């Protein structure tokens, strides 16, 4: 892994809107967050193994970009490393960039629903 940050993206979020807008969104994220390892989900459930793989490759920050389901999958993948957590070993920080239809999790966590503002918040976070 070349980068400390992995972004797991559900391109079908918001009914495929994210896939359509990705050529505009990616440069904003790269500029705001710096170099990223980007992994795209292909089907429901992919977020979990992609998060697990990011940890195994040494990611220090794993971000979920999509809807609440994508965030849940990615968080579940990170939580599979309970052995590392129990041993007191470092596990990656987790963040979200809301891009789904409802944005409920983003609202609950106080994460801006605007993609650029959410990325700026991640960039300023202590876990970076």
Task: Report the location of each language-model feature.
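Catalytic core of DAGKc-family lipid kinases
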Residues: 31-32, 41, 79-128
